[in-house]
Amino acid sequence: MKAWQKLLAQMHKILDEDEENKDYGVRRMQIALEQRGIKRSLSTVRRAMARGNLLHEDRRSPDGLTKADKKAMRPQNIIKQDFSAQEPLRKLLTDITQIPCKDGKLYVSPLFDCYNGEIISLAMDTNMKKELCIKTITEAYKNFDIPSGAIIHSDCGSQYTSGEYKKTLGQLHAVQSMSGVGKCWDNARMESWFATLKKEKIYQLDTTKLTVEEVKTIVWRYTFAYYNTKRITTVNPDGLPPLVYRKTAAKKSAA
């Protein structure tokens, strides 16, 4: 057996470990191999994946969903496309995406931590009213000790410029940041997560044949049973999954 064939065999073992691993790209595959003591260059990994037909097409980018309220007073863009964070729960992103289902549309509203790429809250409903966005935020504050002054960034959709949403952030001592009108790159890391969810899970299914409740379960399981806990995250040290990285970093800082 040639060297590339042996490497490809290891790749298939990695892909077989979890159903969700089937969408591993070159960089995540390289990290997965390194975690098993197999160090290879990106070009070597790419060639082996190409020979084994394991390379994937580029993901589709989801279109923007929320509509700006042009008359509303908007907070400034504080993060200015800087999606890095040195501490957890300090810089958070949110938005809404939709998934077509057999019995309507499912709207998904997450809260994303720039520190480690973790989804710390996920609200879903059959409408995209401001209450959905508010629930996303309040659930996060119930489950996490989010410090005063945490930045919560969104686009300038009417849900996020509503008085109730702003009041909720004020009561939680959060600082609101908002993208410019029509500037999707101002919230690019959140949009990237939606693209990941859809490429790795939603686009693999015909959700128009599934009920809203069935799709809710699929999104929930992907997010909390795979993405947060198992999925290699290339921007984290050693490619650690978001939740694993947060816990590992917390142990080191406490030592």
Feature names for model-found ranges:
Residues 100, 104, 122-145, 161:
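Active-site beta-loop-alpha junctions of metal-dependent nucleic acid enzymes
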Residues 118-122, 176-178, 203-205:
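Short small-residue beta-strand/loop micro-motif enriched in glycine and branched aliphatics
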Residues 1-87, 241-251:
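Basic, flexible linker segments flanking DNA-binding modules
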Residues 1-2, 65-68, 154-156, 162-166, ...:
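RNase H-like two-metal-ion nuclease catalytic core shared by retroviral integrases
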